[in-house]
Amino acid sequence: MAITLREQYLEGFVSSHEMDCMAPQVAAAVRQLRQHTGAGSDFHGWLTLPRDYDKEELARIHAAAEKIREDTDVLVVIGIGGSYLGARSAIELLRSPYYNALGKDGPAIYFAGCNLSGSYLDEILALCEGKRVSLNVISKSGTTTEPALAFRVLRGMMERRYGKEAAGRIYCTTDRARGTLKSLADREGWQTFVIPDDVGGRYSVLTAVGLLPMAVAGIDIDAVLAGAEKAMTELDNDDFSHNPCYRYAAIRNILLRRGKAIEIYASYEPRFTQMGEWLKQLYGESEGKDGKGLFPASVAFTTDLHSMGQFIQDGSRNLFETVIDFITPAADLTVEEDPENLDGLNFLSGMAMRQINRRAMQGTILAHTRGGVPNLVLEVPAINEEEYGYMVYFFMLACGISGYLLGVNPFDQPGVEAYKKNMFALLGKPGYEDLRQELLAKLGE
């Protein structure tokens, strides 16, 4: 169990001298994390979470998940950003993108509160019709607009359907002691789980935020935490030349300084697609501030080779690719021979799909690097709970280091307030009257 960083496709883009120069800078960034001297140090709790996770809380998560699996046909997870992306990515990677159709050993799991679309929420309600439903609402404050609105609608549905018994089907993942959702849960008798004070949303996948939905999906969350703890131990290694996480953070920084402002996360495994969304939030929200940062994007190959492949090969040379390579797929098929061979593919007969997929990956990496796009490859041995936990910790650690290398606070997100103020003003929220008039004038209303 480990992630291997392949650097051979960086030749001509990143020099050994540059890497040597980055070593002391990375060491300084790591000290800011480990010694809690960097900006945002009050949100460093995720660093030791895999080892120090509250065992009583973990037991309650297991018990609640088992109850939900026994008495529920549909679990609706209500949250946005880090409050849902981690769980969704884990379920799709470790179970299947088709989990709700194939997961016959547990309830279907749908995600709400991640947008403001009325039609989306109406369809969630339709999926709940005639089914035994439970809710898992995730919010530290309980007042974030999207999940709060979705919870208002879904809570109403639950109370009309179950009456007082609805309380036994609502699970809240929220602050330990304060906030609107915590107060409401205490009043109504809903079971609660804790989002630690020192863990921010996008770093919270290894808390109840991610672990409860994962456990309901039948994922071994003890193995997830064990994999993350192994990463925590192995990556606490000051030998820069042999630490793939530190080297990954350094390479990203070098490429940014060379004008490669876009990082594309690429995988040849469709199960990884939602993980790409999680990475986009993790890195985009952590690094994108003070006029700095790499812009994170994601592609699903080979699908996107038939759309974005043209741009990556021949477009602006301001990007690089980070390829996540799963050595052993979750399942595989072998190509059969066709006597007619009308498609001309009999030369592939007897080959496993993973072999074909790997050759496609290798050919693409060679083509893109020749076209001026640096590629770094992160090899993950297999798709299982331990490797997932290891991978999640790897990326979070690299993100914290990368933020400090940039000179930004990787644990805040001040930029998200601008659109919220405008939205609240336009919706007529009390206290925003002057801004509302200003914005309506700009909109010509």
What are these regions (language model features)?
Residues 66-238:
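Glycine-rich phosphate-binding loops that contact phosphosugars or nucleotide phosphates
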Residues 48-50, 74-81, 134-141, 261-269, ...:
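Short glycine-rich or small-residue beta-strand-to-loop segments that form or flank ligand, phosphate
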Residues 297-383:
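Helicase-primase coupling helices
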Residues 364-427:
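C-terminal helical cap and adjacent loop that interface with cofactors, partners, or active-site loops
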Residues 60-73, 124-133, 251-261, 312-317:
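Glycine-rich phosphate/diphosphate-binding loops that line cofactor/substrate pockets in enzymes
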Residues 161-321, 327, 413-445:
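Active-site phosphate/pyrophosphate-binding segments
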Residues 1-69, 337-343, 347, 435-445:
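Extended, charge-enriched "interface" segments that sit outside catalytic cores
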Residues 92-95, 126-128, 152-154, 186-188, ...:
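Short, solvent-exposed amphipathic alpha-helical segments in soluble enzyme
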